């Protein structure tokens, strides 16, 4: 995990602090947190709370519903992990906290953060935080729950499954967190989320966290949240600070050659290349590897073991280029990515923000390069308008920008 002291916090004016009770708390020591939780926070490498952590943790610990929005790479996972852990009673080995994530990779990563921060609270219960995701045996899920899990982190489909089977007892649940809430409440997941709510205690605390919070999602929350504290970002503040955004005008048949030229021109620490389809990802990775550019690729139809291996080699730096679909656009935490390339522009505005957030995480500088065909121009203009930003054409002396 990156040192939180190196985060360049969002400016306070970026937030719509329009509700009483929201004020930045600049130090973890000034928050109402258990001493053993503070030990876990500092041992995990956190130094100073980021802007979203300064605003969201204390309202979370009060027990009320909360809707919190912050840009990618600014510490959302840390914010809800700390708030969640403070709300639990570790004297009782019953399931008290549930975190739902849209992908298994994000669920595994979140569970790792919660486990590390909660290490001293758990006092020897190494299985206090368990994951429930597809691609694993249901019998293993049973064993995790019987071992005394206090926090469950999972994907909606698997959580629905183990709950319906009676393996996951929900009567003692205190807190539900929806990570990447806009995705979780989209059509693909909404039905499963509502199914899970059928099993939850009526008075459960609900917390929503995401980089984007569209109006239709906020409208949906009225169905299952009670007078939530809202910590939202002004739309004009949603473009990621520290990430320079460019476009290259190129037609489809010349994209590959343009990408090759780009990699021969500049020195890149690590990069993520996004394409819109599984077939395009496989094809692009094959073409790059054949041209002696060592790359790895990942998409949702790959076996889970292969996806985990790809992410592991990319995280530890063995692989420097990852070609993928939007599968990793949400929250996958790789610290040394300095360039994100949209080989295909995303199909919606929210995905753009999640994608370019892979570069420049935790205050580091990053670059986003968009390949734009003639038919993409209107989409690019919509992105600029939506985020009140300007995406310039890639300069000829681009290589010099990486050294700044």
UniProtKB/Swiss-Prot annotation:
Its EC number is 3.6.4.13. It comes from the Eukaryota. Gene3D superfamilies: P-loop containing nucleotide triphosphate hydrolases. Belongs to the DEAD box helicase family. eIF4A subfamily. It comes from Trypanosoma cruzi (strain CL Brener). Residues 242-402 form the Helicase C-terminal domain. The keyword Protein biosynthesis applies. eIF4F is a multi-subunit complex, the composition of which varies with external and internal environmental conditions. It is composed of at least EIF4A, EIF4E and EIF4G. A motif (DEAD box) lies at residues 179-182. This is Probable eukaryotic initiation factor 4A. It holds the Pfam family DEAD.
């Amino acid at each position: 995990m990156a040192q939180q002291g190196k985060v360049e916090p969002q400016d306070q004016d970026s937030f719509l602090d329009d509700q009483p009770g929201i004020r930045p708390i600049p130090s973890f020591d000034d928050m109402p947190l258990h001493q053993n939780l503070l030990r876990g926070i500092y041992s995990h490498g956190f130094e100073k709370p980021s802007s979203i952590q300064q605003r969201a943790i204390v309202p979370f610990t009060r027990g009320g519903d909360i809707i919190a929005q912050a840009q990618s790479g600014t510490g959302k996972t840390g914010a809800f992990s700390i708030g969640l852990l403070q709300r639990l009673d570790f004297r009782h080995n019953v399931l008290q906290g549930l975190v739902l994530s849209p992908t298994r990779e994000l669920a595994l990563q979140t569970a790792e953060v919660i486990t590390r921060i909660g290490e001293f609270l758990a006092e020897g219960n190494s299985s206090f935080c368990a994951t429930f995701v597809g691609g694993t045996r249901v019998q293993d899920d049973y064993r995790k729950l019987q071992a005394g899990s206090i926090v469950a982190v999972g994907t909606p489909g698997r959580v629905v499954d183990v709950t319906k089977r009676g393996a996951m007892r929900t009567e003692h649940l205190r807190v539900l967190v929806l990570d990447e809430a806009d995705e979780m409440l989209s059509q693909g997941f909404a039905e499963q989320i509502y199914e899970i709510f059928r099993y939850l205690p009526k008075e459960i605390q609900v917390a929503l966290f995401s980089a984007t919070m569209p109006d239709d999602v906020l409208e949906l929350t009225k169905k299952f949240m009670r007078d939530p504290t809202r910590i939202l970002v002004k739309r004009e503040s949603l473009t990621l600070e520290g990430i320079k955004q460019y476009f290259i005008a190129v037609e489809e048949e010349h994209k590959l050659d343009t990408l090759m030229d780009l990699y021969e021109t500049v020195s890149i620490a690590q990069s993520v290349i996004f394409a819109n389809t599984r077939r395009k990802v496989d094809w692009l990775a094959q073409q790059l590897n054949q041209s002696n550019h060592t790359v790895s690729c990942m998409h949702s139809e790959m076996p889970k073991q292969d996806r985990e291996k790809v992410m592991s080699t990319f995280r530890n730096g063995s692989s420097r280029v990852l070609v993928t679909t939007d599968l990793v656009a949400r929250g996958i935490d790789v610290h040394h990515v300095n360039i994100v390339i949209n080989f295909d522009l995303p199909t919606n505005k929210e995905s753009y923000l999640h994608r370019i957030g892979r570069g420049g995480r935790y205050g580091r500088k990053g670059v986003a390069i968009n390949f734009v065909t003639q038919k993409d121009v209107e989409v690019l203009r919509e992105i600029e308008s939506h985020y009140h930003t300007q995406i310039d054409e890639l300069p000829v002396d681009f290589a010099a920008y990486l050294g700044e």
